[in-house]
Amino acid sequence: MAASLRLLGAASGLRYWSRRLRPAAGSFAAVCSRSVASKTPVGFIGLGNMGNPMAKNLMKHGYPLIIYDVFPDACKEFQDAGEQVVSSPADVAEKADRIITMLPTSINAIEAYSGANGILKKVKKGSLLIDSSTIDPAVSKELAKEVEKMGAVFMDAPVSGGVGAARSGNLTFMVGGVEDEFAAAQELLGCMGSNVVYCGAVGTGQAAKICNNMLLAISMIGTAEAMNLGIRLGLDPKLLAKILNMSSGRCWSSDTYNPVPGVMDGVPSANNYQGGFGATLMAKDLGLAQDSATSTKSPILLGSLAHQIYRMMCAKGYSKKDFSSVFQFLREEETF
């Protein structure tokens, strides 16, 4: 690892690790020494669009893996690479004392941890359990309580950056949990991400992720609307995107993940909206934001509208397409 843990912005209390930060020589040696000394097997549960490349980056850093996925075919390439595949989350917990889970929903996470063959059936005392799923903060807190009863440590560490960042190892991790355990989590998360941010107690990582994804959905819908309007007004989409990205309307949805086919290469819109982050998952995350807003009495007018739009998309056949397919949805649905 090319960076050490630092305390930045003392006034704000923000604590994070980034590859862009250069450590003092002594701390670099300490991090490298700890990393080499502790490359014992790591459990990884959930090998979907995000989990697959995340697990591969752990392999690249020399960590042996204990693998489980509910779909056996997802494990095959890891098994072919010499990694150990087991038949349940409980079996992962029996063989590894550091486990990362990357699952689609709160229900999946509850089953993986507390189910009949869940992690908690065989978890060892002192184990570190890191959940990188995006789930309800309240569920994270309940799982943490159950894990603590077993003498283990639970941290929520959802991610941002999408499949591209997962492949390149440049994810951002938002981490909630006991601060004293952050360094141990960072050792693993730093293999998969370029920014690892400590957010506070268990559940705060999920809170940060929910806020981020709500804003992402709103900005994607806004980008899709602006691009659609400009095209219908006679503008070339590539030219319009270029103008937006050198102007005040620039955002990640316009300059990195543009939703219009033909504007960018290497994004889902260039591949009939296949891969990436599904509209179903975005609708799920917006539902989490809606629930959190209701419980905290926080107005989210645009967030609520975004939730309605993505729910409509899923009902009209877009559920398996990337969330940027909202551009296609708006192009085809003219009666709002």
From Swiss-Prot:
<feature type="modified residue" description="N6-acetyllysine; alternate">
    <location>
        <position position="321"/>
    </location>
</feature>
<feature type="modified residue" description="N6-acetyllysine; alternate">
    <location>
        <position position="60"/>
    </location>
</feature>
<keyword id="KW-0520">NAD</keyword>
<feature type="binding site">
    <location>
        <begin position="40"/>
        <end position="69"/>
    </location>
    <ligand>
        <name>NAD(+)</name>
    </ligand>
</feature>
<feature type="transit peptide" description="Mitochondrion">
    <location>
        <begin position="1"/>
        <end position="36"/>
    </location>
</feature>
<dbReference type="InterPro" id="IPR011548">
    <property type="entry name" value="HIBADH"/>
</dbReference>
<dbReference type="GO" id="GO:0005739">
    <property type="term" value="C:mitochondrion"/>
</dbReference>
<feature type="active site">
    <location>
        <position position="209"/>
    </location>
</feature>
<dbReference type="GO" id="GO:0051287">
    <property type="term" value="F:NAD binding"/>
</dbReference>
<dbReference type="InterPro" id="IPR013328">
    <property type="entry name" value="6PGD_dom2"/>
</dbReference>
<keyword id="KW-0007">Acetylation</keyword>
<dbReference type="InterPro" id="IPR006115">
    <property type="entry name" value="6PGDH_NADP-bd"/>
</dbReference>
<feature type="modified residue" description="N6-acetyllysine">
    <location>
        <position position="145"/>
    </location>
</feature>
<feature type="modified residue" description="N6-succinyllysine; alternate">
    <location>
        <position position="149"/>
    </location>
</feature>
<feature type="modified residue" description="N6-succinyllysine; alternate">
    <location>
        <position position="60"/>
    </location>
</feature>
<feature type="binding site">
    <location>
        <position position="134"/>
    </location>
    <ligand>
        <name>NAD(+)</name>
    </ligand>
</feature>
<feature type="modified residue" description="N6-succinyllysine; alternate">
    <location>
        <position position="321"/>
    </location>
</feature>
<feature type="modified residue" description="N6-acetyllysine; alternate">
    <location>
        <position position="76"/>
    </location>
</feature>
<dbReference type="InterPro" id="IPR008927">
    <property type="entry name" value="6-PGluconate_DH-like_C_sf"/>
</dbReference>
<feature type="modified residue" description="N6-acetyllysine; alternate">
    <location>
        <position position="238"/>
    </location>
</feature>
<feature type="modified residue" description="N6-succinyllysine">
    <location>
        <position position="141"/>
    </location>
</feature>
<feature type="modified residue" description="N6-acetyllysine; alternate">
    <location>
        <position position="242"/>
    </location>
</feature>
<protein>
    <recommendedName>
        <fullName>3-hydroxyisobutyrate dehydrogenase, mitochondrial</fullName>
        <ecNumber>1.1.1.31</ecNumber>
    </recommendedName>
</protein>
<keyword id="KW-0496">Mitochondrion</keyword>
<dbReference type="Pfam" id="PF03446">
    <property type="entry name" value="NAD_binding_2"/>
</dbReference>
<dbReference type="GO" id="GO:0006574">
    <property type="term" value="P:valine catabolic process"/>
</dbReference>
<feature type="modified residue" description="N6-acetyllysine">
    <location>
        <position position="121"/>
    </location>
</feature>
<comment type="similarity">
    <text>Belongs to the HIBADH-related family. 3-hydroxyisobutyrate dehydrogenase subfamily.</text>
</comment>
<feature type="modified residue" description="N6-succinyllysine; alternate">
    <location>
        <position position="242"/>
    </location>
</feature>
<feature type="modified residue" description="N6-acetyllysine; alternate">
    <location>
        <position position="149"/>
    </location>
</feature>
<keyword id="KW-0809">Transit peptide</keyword>
<dbReference type="GO" id="GO:0008442">
    <property type="term" value="F:3-hydroxyisobutyrate dehydrogenase activity"/>
</dbReference>
<feature type="modified residue" description="N6-succinyllysine; alternate">
    <location>
        <position position="238"/>
    </location>
</feature>
<feature type="modified residue" description="N6-succinyllysine">
    <location>
        <position position="297"/>
    </location>
</feature>
<dbReference type="InterPro" id="IPR015815">
    <property type="entry name" value="HIBADH-related"/>
</dbReference>
<feature type="binding site">
    <location>
        <begin position="103"/>
        <end position="104"/>
    </location>
    <ligand>
        <name>NAD(+)</name>
    </ligand>
</feature>
<keyword id="KW-0101">Branched-chain amino acid catabolism</keyword>
<dbReference type="GO" id="GO:0050661">
    <property type="term" value="F:NADP binding"/>
</dbReference>
<feature type="modified residue" description="N6-succinyllysine; alternate">
    <location>
        <position position="76"/>
    </location>
</feature>
<dbReference type="InterPro" id="IPR002204">
    <property type="entry name" value="3-OH-isobutyrate_DH-rel_CS"/>
</dbReference>
<dbReference type="Pfam" id="PF14833">
    <property type="entry name" value="NAD_binding_11"/>
</dbReference>
<feature type="binding site">
    <location>
        <position position="284"/>
    </location>
    <ligand>
        <name>NAD(+)</name>
    </ligand>
</feature>
